[in-house]
Amino acid sequence: MTLSILVAHDLQRVIGFENQLPWHLPNDLKHVKKLSTGHTLVMGRKTFESIGKPLPNRRNVVLTSDTSFNVEGVDVIHSIEDIYQLPGHVFIFGGQTLFEEMIDKVDDMYITVIEGKFRGDTFFPPYTFEDWEVASSVEGKLDEKNTIPHTFLHLIRKK
């Protein structure tokens, strides 16, 4: 099993505001699709509700304490420990609480750094490059639909 974080955050580590992304960046959505298609996304219930439906062509797993939570096309787990039973490449997809629980346990992180400061009420936990090696850093292309500068980082935990 490979365990990764998949996240976009701004320069202040904002990841959301009122259960939505504070920015519109189609390049990041394509990046998520490219990385996670054919694999497993694990997210908290609020993150799932912000998306509104299972993402296609990948396994969608929702971690929730709500034992009555049931959505077609979604697998439900009720504890962090259940994540370790999932096969293949597993991406931790949010939100804040799940990231806080898992940042010290993942092998690597795929981070889209949004080069701006946005209003937010949910945040990605602090991390330092002392703990992570930059495997790749690619500037996102700007165009009429992608107007916010952004960088795609792949960080691997230092041994």
Swiss-Prot record:
Residues binding substrate are: 6-7, 28, 50, 58, 93
> Which residues take part in binding NADP(+)?
7-8, 15-20, 44-47, 63-66, 93-98, 101, 122
Q: Which Pfam families match?
A: DHFR_1
Q: Which GO terms describe its cellular component?
A: cytosol
Task: Provide a GO biological process annotation.
Answer: dihydrofolate metabolic process
Read off the InterPro entries from this record.
DHFR (IPR012259), DHFR-like_dom_sf (IPR024072), DHFR_CS (IPR017925), DHFR_dom (IPR001796)
EC code: 1.5.1.3
Q: What keyword terms does UniProt attach to this protein?
A: NADP, One-carbon metabolism, Oxidoreductase
- Record's superkingdom? Bacteria
Keyword set includes Signal: no
Record GO terms (molecular function):
dihydrofolate reductase activity; NADP binding
Chain coiled-coil ranges: none
User: Where does the record place the DHFR domain?
Assistant: 2-157
Top enzyme category: oxidoreductase
Task: Give the catalysed reaction(s), semicolon-separated.
Answer: (6S)-5,6,7,8-tetrahydrofolate + NADP(+) = 7,8-dihydrofolate + NADPH + H(+)
- Pathway, per UniProt? Cofactor biosynthesis; tetrahydrofolate biosynthesis; 5,6,7,8-tetrahydrofolate from 7,8-dihydrofolate: step 1/1
As for family, the record states: Belongs to the dihydrofolate reductase family.
Protein function: Key enzyme in folate metabolism. Catalyzes an essential reaction for de novo glycine and purine synthesis, and for DNA precursor synthesis.
Give the misc comment: There are two DhfR isozymes in S.aureus, this one is chromosomal and is sensitive to trimethoprim.
The protein's name in its UniProt record:
Dihydrofolate reductase
Highest classification ranks of the organism = Bacteria, Bacillati, Bacillota, Bacilli, Bacillales
